[in-house]
Amino acid sequence: MKLKLKRLKKNIKNYFRSIQAAKNEPGLIKRGGEAGKLIEKVIIENSLINILDIGTWNGLGSTKTLIEVLQENFDEYSLVSIETDKIFHKQALKNLKHLLNPSIQLLLGRIIEIDELPNSRNIDFEAAGLIPDNVEWLIQDIRRYKKVDNIFDNLPTKFDFILFDGGEFSNYSEFFKLYKTTKYFGLDDTNTYKQYEVIKYIENNFKEFQLVYSLETFSIYKVIN
């Protein structure tokens, strides 16, 4: 009973924290920032018009950047942005209302199953720059996943560019499921666990990838088919 009460308190605390973050914390990838400029550069130079954005947040970071770049440079394009958190998805729809059109889809859902998330017992927290208490992020991911549908089968089968900027613990499975469907992809937070397994995979399969641009915490790769 005590454990259930403790879990309930944590869930409630996380709920109100999410509401505040959705309203007050803009995304980190801004169009005028270093990562935003690289995204814009690679999209324009390579005419990347079919884009998947994993991790909408509240819409005011990478999603807004992608929308503006596409709208200002191409007559025809497609952007799909996915968010698993209902609170952030709702806020993104509100924040981006003035920019939305039929070529832009802000979707609520997930593209992997709960059993595709890592088991906390198999996570090397220290090597990944985490502490054991960060397992709470995984618990909250699972809680959110139970509330939304898997929309993977509703996605297009080919993309020109995918931005992998989703959950700390879902990112690798999402990457592994999708990287062969795209020409280019971006990795945000490359210094965190989010991209830890992804970068290991790229290093072990280096013939499949070409590093195009790299910043301290952001990289863009080309997929070699």
Regions from the PLM with identified roles:
Residues M1-G186, T190-N225:
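A short alpha-helical cap/connector motif
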